[in-house]
């Protein structure tokens, strides 16, 4: 069954009362989305998820998925409860899980705590899972609404959705140029052509994404650290596309490889040459060439 088929099937099962109390649903889902974003950089490869528990129009619990391997958003919201959740409405950005993983199924916690209604932003993008939790909840007499701020909730999990549906990473390209189409002065002496806001955005992206990839020429010209400079930020894995293994051993990415992971993708098969980098803590990925460069299609599947 495809994801689209699963969505159609769930649409028939769900009691979609979006017109009634729509503004209230939107407001609480907006809060759940804001909570979910707090997990950026800490939950990969899991999705960002936020949850809000409401009883008699009052918020009694809030939570989000804070760290990979730890409690999911729904269980954190229940943990945060300041009143009995029995009869409450749960707003959650993503369909609750119904399988045993690093944590127990969230559907079990919802049922056990007597929650009366669950409002879901978007279904699980995994075609094998989409709609299953909805069905389980409905079978236990819980009202379910799906699709509140659906596009915003889908955008929250764009990285997770890409991987879970294709097995490939979500890639974001960062590119800066001047209004006349240049990326640097002809001498190469220019340091930045972007402003403070753009540079801050770069740091936020480094914190959010698992890896950052550059070509060897960037290393040769700039000797970048490729780290996250945000307070309490998380450093991404540094990936260097270096077909002929020209990255200098004195480069920052090599010298600090034991502190911040550095992966070098190369077509070089010389074991002794690769060992020099491995001694500094680098991980060498042997990737075939295509048109004289690293085959990115192959690299994306490693």
Q: Language-model features: where?
A:
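Short, small/polar residue-rich loop motifs at catalytic or cofactor-binding pockets
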Residues: 45-48, 170-171
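Zn2+-dependent cytidine deaminase-like catalytic core
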Residues: 53-152, 237, 263, 268, ...
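Flexible, polar/acidic helix-loop-strand segments at domain edges
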Residues: 157-165
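Short, basic/aromatic recognition patches
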Residues: 25-44, 163
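Short, positively charged and aromatic/hydrophobic N-terminal segments
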Residues: 3, 9-15, 19
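Active-site ligand-binding patch in enzyme domains
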Residues: 162, 173-179, 183-302
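Short beta-strand scaffold segments in enzyme catalytic cores
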Residues: 49-55, 175-176
